[in-house]
Curated annotation (Swiss-Prot):
Xref: InterPro entries: aa-tRNA-synth_II/BPL/LPL, B3/B4_tRNA-bd, DNA-bd_dom_put_sf, Fdx_antiC-bd, Fdx_antiC-bd_sf, NA-bd_OB-fold, Phe-tRNA-ligase_IIc_bsu, Phe-tRNA-ligase_IIc_bsu_bact
One GO biological process term: phenylalanyl-tRNA aminoacylation
Biological classification of the source: Bacteria, Bacillati, Bacillota, Bacilli, Bacillales
CDD domains: PheRS_beta_core, tRNA_bind_bactPheRS
Protein's name according to its UniProt entry: Phenylalanine--tRNA ligase beta subunit
Family membership: Belongs to the phenylalanyl-tRNA synthetase beta subunit family. Type 1 subfamily.
Domain B5 span(s) in chain numbering: 409-484
C-alpha cells in the first residue's frame, strides 16, 4: 500500500517525525516499509502558468508557440508539442533552470527557429506514473482548474512536496489497508490519538426507500448490505486535492463520483460502489449467488463467466456487479449520470477471495474483502461517501439508507496478567506502562487484581488469543527495548536421523532442479480422493470455511497440479516442483485421523532449455524416474528400487509404475492422463508420490569411500535379442547376480525394434565394465565373468546373444 506522508500528518496536530524516521518507526513495530520516496527530490523551479495566447509554429505542424505568464514580470514564449494546449489554460510550467525527474534540466532553447524559455509539463514529466494520469490528459499536458493562482509553486499545489511510504501489509494486518488504520498505528508510535475524519455537512431530502429496496438471499455471505441515494448530480472532474491524493496512492482519477468511492476505500478501508440508478432497470436490488455459467461484462470491458457460489448484485433479473470484486459495465457511472445508488456492504471474505481467484480479477475492493475488514465501519464510510459525492457534484443527498443487517456484534475480550506478560516477554513493564500502551492502541483495559481484561476494537479482528495481546505489548513497548536474556538451562543441539534424512532429500531434489512448494493441507471433496496412495476414507471438516477447503488431503499431487496450472497460466511454462508434507486418513469412530508424511513431485514443460549449444529437452518418464532412483541412492538405501507397471485413475495407463522397495509398495510415478492435462491446460506432465516413512525405515548401508582405482578397467559389449515384454530391470538384475565381484557397472546404450528381429522381439545392447582394485585384469578373468552372464541370460530370459 502506498501511503502519503502528508496525509498521515493530517491526522495529528503536531507531528514529530520525518518521513524516513516514520518509516523506520513503523518497521520496528512489525509492518515492513519497503521504501520511502521523496517526490520533490528531483523537482525544482516549477510554477503555475497561464497560456495568454497559442498559435501554430510557423515551421512545424505539430508544435505550438505559446505566450505564458508565470511568476515573472513579463510573459515568456514556450514551444509546446502537446495536442491539447490552448489559450486561457492554467498549466504547469518548468522554468529555465528547472529540474525534472530523470535528471532533465530545462534550458533556453531554439526549436525550429523559435525561442522556447521553459516547458509546459504533463503529469508524467513530473514523475507520476502514466497508469495514474487521468485519461483526459494521458496524451498531453495537465490542465489545472481555472481558479488556481498564476505563479504559485506547482510542486506544492500538486502535493509533490511529499514522501510516499511503500507498506508491505501482511494478511493479518488488514486494518492497515486504510489511512485510518495507518493513523491508529502511527498514533500508538508517537503517543497521540489520531483525529477522526469529518464528513461534509450536507442536508438530506426525501427518503431512500422511495427509490429502491434491497433483498439478500444468503445472509451468511452478505451480513450487511446498504444503499445510499444521491440525486441531481453533475458528473465532472474531481477537485485537485482529491485527484492528487488518489494519484499518489497509485489510483487513476475518473470523475467526482468514482473518485469519492476510491477515496473512501483508502480512508476507511471500506470499499464502496456506485451504480447509475437509471441504468439498474429496477427499483429492487437482489444479492444472490450466481448461477452456473451466468455472464456479466465488467467495468474493464471483459465478459466474464461466473460460477455457482460467486456472489452477485442483481436488479432482480441479471447481474449488475460481482460482489466485492468489480461492478458491471451495464450500470457504470458516466458523464450522463444524474442519480447514483451508492453501495456499502460487508461480504464473506472467503467468498470474495474465491471469486477473485477463479476470475483472475484482483481489485482494490477484493483485496480488502479477501483479507477481512471491520464489519462496523461501513455505515460511517457510506455516510461520508454519500455526503462527499453530494458536495462535489452539487447533488441532493437523499435521507436515510436502505439496508439489510444480519451482523452479530460480539465483544472480543481477552484475559492475561502483568505477571505473564513480563515472564513471557522477559521484561519488567509496570502496570502504568501497560495502561499507556493499551490506551495508545485504542484498546479498553480493565484491571481486576492481577488479571488484565482487554477489550479489542472491531478494527483489529486479527487479535483473538492471549499471544496476540503479548505481541501488541511487545510491538509498542519496542522490540529493541526488550532485554536480551540467556536461557536458564543449557540445551544440547543436534539433528535426529530422520531430520538429517529429510534435509538430504530436500537438498537433493533442489539440486536436481525441483523447486519446493508449500500447498494447503485442506482441499475440496473431489480432490481429497484423487491420486491417493491408499484407499482409506477421507477426513471431512465439520465446519469448513468453503467447499474448496472442506476435506483434509490424502495426496499432495492434486495441489501440485493446481500450482503448475497456476504458473502456466502466467506464462511460466517449465515447472518442476516437489513438496514434503502430511496427508490424512480417517479412522473408525471419533479417533483422530492417521497422519502420514509423503513426498510428491511434478515436472512439465522442458527439462533443458534451448540455447546456442543445445536444443530443448522436454520432460519424460525417465527424467523423473532417474530423479527418484537418485534420491533412493542418496539416502544410502541398501535394497534396490523396483518398478512395476500399474494402472491408476487419472494417470496414463501405459506410462505408470508403482515403486516397490523391500517387497513393499511405497509409491507411484507416472504421466498424467491426457484428459487431466487438458482440464488444467498442461502439456505432458509427470508426477510421483512416495511414503516418506517407508524411505526412512528402509535398510541403510553406511557410505564407505574407496580410493581411486590404480588399475585399468575392461569393458565388454553384449547385444541381446529378447521378448518384447522383457524389461531392462529384469535383464540388469540377472547381469548383476551373475557378473561376479569384478563387475562394477552396467550401461544400456541401445534399444532396437523392427520387423527384421521377428515378431514381439527387441534388441538391447549393454556395456559391462569390469575392474579389480588390487591387480590388473587379464582377458581370461573378464571372459569367464562374461560367459557366466551370457549363460544366465540364456537360461532365465531365453535371451539370444547377437
Amino acid at each position: 500500500m502506498l501511503v502519503s506522508y502528508n496525509w498521515v500528518k493530517e491526522f495529528f496536530q503536531d507531528f514529530p517525525l520525518t518521513a524516513e524516521e516514520l518509516g523506520e518507526a513503523i518497521t520496528r513495530t512489525g509492518i515492513e516499509i519497503e521504501g520511502v520516496e521523496e517526490l520533490s527530490a528531483s523537482l525544482k523551479n516549477v510554477v503555475v502558468g497561464e497560456v495568454l495566447s497559442c498559435e501554430r509554429h510557423p515551421d512545424a505542424e505539430k508544435l505550438n508557440k505559446c505566450l505564458v505568464q508565470t511568476d515573472e514580470a513579463e510573459p515568456v514564449q514556450i514551444i509546446c508539442g502537446a495536442p491539447n494546449v490552448a489559450a486561457g489554460q492554467k498549466v504547469i510550467v518548468a522554468k529555465v533552470g528547472a529540474r525534472l525527474p530523470g535528471g532533465l534540466k530545462i534550458k533556453r532553447a531554439k526549436l525550429r527557429g523559435e525561442v522556447s524559455e521553459g516547458m509546459i509539463c504533463s503529469l508524467a514529466e513530473l514523475g507520476f506514473e502514466s497508469k495514474v494520469v487521468p485519461k483526459a490528459y494521458a496524451e498531453g499536458i495537465y490542465v489545472l482548474p481555472a481558479h488556481v493562482e498564476t505563479g504559485v509553486n506547482a510542486i506544492t499545489l500538486l502535493g509533490l512536496d511529499d514522501a510516499i511510504l511503500d507498506m508491505a501489509i501482511t494478511p493479518n494486518r488488514a486494518d492497515a489497508l486504510s489511512m485510518k488504520g495507518v493513523a491508529h498505528e502511527v498514533g500508538a508510535i508517537i503517543h497521540q490519538k489520531p483525529a477522526q475524519p469529518t464528513e461534509p455537512d450536507v442536508s438530506e431530502k426525501g427518503k431512500a426507500e422511495d427509490f429502491i429496496s434491497v433483498e439478500v438471499e444468503n445472509p451468511a455471505e452478505t451480513p450487511y448490505y446498504a444503499i445510499k441515494m444521491v440525486e441531481n448530480i453533475e458528473i465532472k472532474e474531481s477537485p485537485l486535492w482529491l485527484q492528487t491524493k488518489l494519484m499518489k496512492a497509485g489510483i487513476r482519477p475518473h470523475n467526482n463520483v468514482v473518485d469519492v468511492t476510491n477515496y473512501i476505500n483508502l480512508l476507511y478501508g471500506q470499499p464502496l460502489h456506485s451504480f447509475d440508478y437509471d441504468k439498474i432497470g429496477s427499483k429492487k436490488i437482489v444479492v444472490r449467488s450466481a448461477k452456473e455459467q451466468e455472464e456479466i461484462t465488467t467495468l474493464d470491458g471483459e465478459k466474464r463467466t461466473l460460477q455457482a457460489g460467486h456472489t452477485v448484485i442483481t436488479n432482480g433479473v441479471e447481474p449488475i456487479a460481482i460482489a466485492g470484486v468489480m461492478g458491471g459495465e451495464f450500470s457504470e457511472v458516466t458523464e450522463n449520470t444524474t442519480t447514483v445508488a451508492l453501495e456499502g456492504a460487508i461480504f464473506s471474505s472467503s467468498s470474495i477471495g474465491k471469486a477473485s481467484r477463479e476470475l483472475y480479477l484482483r481489485t482494490e475492493a477484493s483485496i480488502r474483502y479477501d483479507k477481512g475488514s471491520d464489519a462496523w465501519k461501513v455505515e460511517k464510510a457510506l455516510a461520508h461517501g454519500g455526503a462527499l459525492i453530494a458536495e462535489l457534484s452539487g447533488g441532493t443527498l437523499v435521507g436515510g439508507v436502505v439496508e439489510v443487517d444480519n451482523r452479530e456484534k460480539a465483544v472480543n475480550k481477552i484475559e492475561t496478567s502483568l505477571t505473564r506478560i513480563n515472564r513471557i516477554l522477559g521484561t519488567a513493564i509496570t502496570l502504568t506502562e501497560i495502561e499507556t500502551i493499551f490506551d495508545r492502541l485504542g484498546f479498553v483495559l480493565e484491571v481486576k487484581n492481577d488479571a488484565l481484561i482487554i477489550e479489542v476494537p472491531t478494527r483489529r479482528w486479527d487479535i483473538t488469543i492471549e499471544a496476540d495481546i503479548l505481541e501488541e505489548v511487545a510491538r509498542i513497548y519496542g522490540y529493541d527495548e526488550i532485554p536480551v536474556t540467556l536461557p536458564a538451562t543449557s540445551t544440547t543441539g543436534g539433528l535426529s536421523d530422520s531430520q538429517k534424512a529429510r534435509r538430504v532429500m530436500r537438498a537433493y531434489l533442489e539440486g536436481a532442479g525441483l523447486n519446493q512448494a508449500l500447498t494447503y493441507s485442506l482441499t475440496s471433496k473431489k480432490d481429497a480422493t484423487r491420486l491417493a496412495l491408499s484407499d482409506e476414507k477421507t477426513v471431512a471438516l465439520s465446519m469448513p470455511m468453503s467447499e474448496e477447503h472442506s476435506h483434509l488431503r490424502t495426496s499432495i499431487v492434486p495441489q501440485l497440479i493446481r500450482s503448475a496450472s497456476y504458473n502456466i497460466a502466467r506464462k511460466n511454462m517449465d515447472v518442476a516442483l516437489y513438496e514434503m508434507g502430511t496427508v490424512f486418513y480417517a479412522t473408525e469412530g471419533d479417533n483422530l485421523p492417521i497422519e502420514q508424511e509423503h513426498l510428491a513431485g511434478l515436472i512439465t514443460g522442458n527439462w533443458h532449455i534451448a540455447d546456442w549449444q543445445k536444443t530443448p529437452k522436454p520432460v519424460d518418464f525417465f527424467v523423473l524416474k532417474g530423479i527418484v532412483e537418485g534420491l533412493v541412492n542418496k539416502l544410502g538405501i541398501k535394497s534396490e528400487l523396483h518398478w512395476k507397471q500399474t494402472e491408476k485413475e487419472e494417470l496414463h495407463p501405459g506410462r505408470t509404475a508403482s515403486l516397490v522397495l523391500e517387497g513393499q509398495e511405497i509409491g507411484y510415478l507416472g504421466a498424467l492422463h491426457p484428459a487431466v492435462e487438458a482440464n488444467y491446460d498442461l502439456k505432458e506432465t509427470y508426477v510421483f508420490e512416495i511414503n516418506v516413512a517407508a524411505l526412512l525405515d528402509a535398510t541403510k548401508e553406511k557410505v564407505v569411500y574407496h580410493p581411486i582405482p590404480r588399475y585399468p578397467e575392461m569393458t565388454r559389449d553384449l547385444a541381446l535379442l529378447v521378448d518384447k515384454d522383457t524389461n531392462h530391470a529384469a535383464i540388469s538384475q540377472v547381469i548383476k547376480e551373475h557378473g561376479g565381484k569384478l563387475l562394477v557397472d552396467i550401461e544400456l546404450f541401445d534399444i532396437f525394434e523392427g520387423e527384421s528381429l521377428g515378431e514381439n522381439k527387441k534388441s538391447l545392447a549393454y556395456t559391462l565394465t569390469f575392474l579389480d582394485s588390487e591387480r590388473t585384469l587379464v582377458e581370461e578373468d573378464v571372459q569367464k565373468a562374461t560367459n557366466k552372464v551370457v549363460e544366465a541370460l540364456q537360461e532365465k530370459l531365453n535371451a539370444i546373444i547377437r
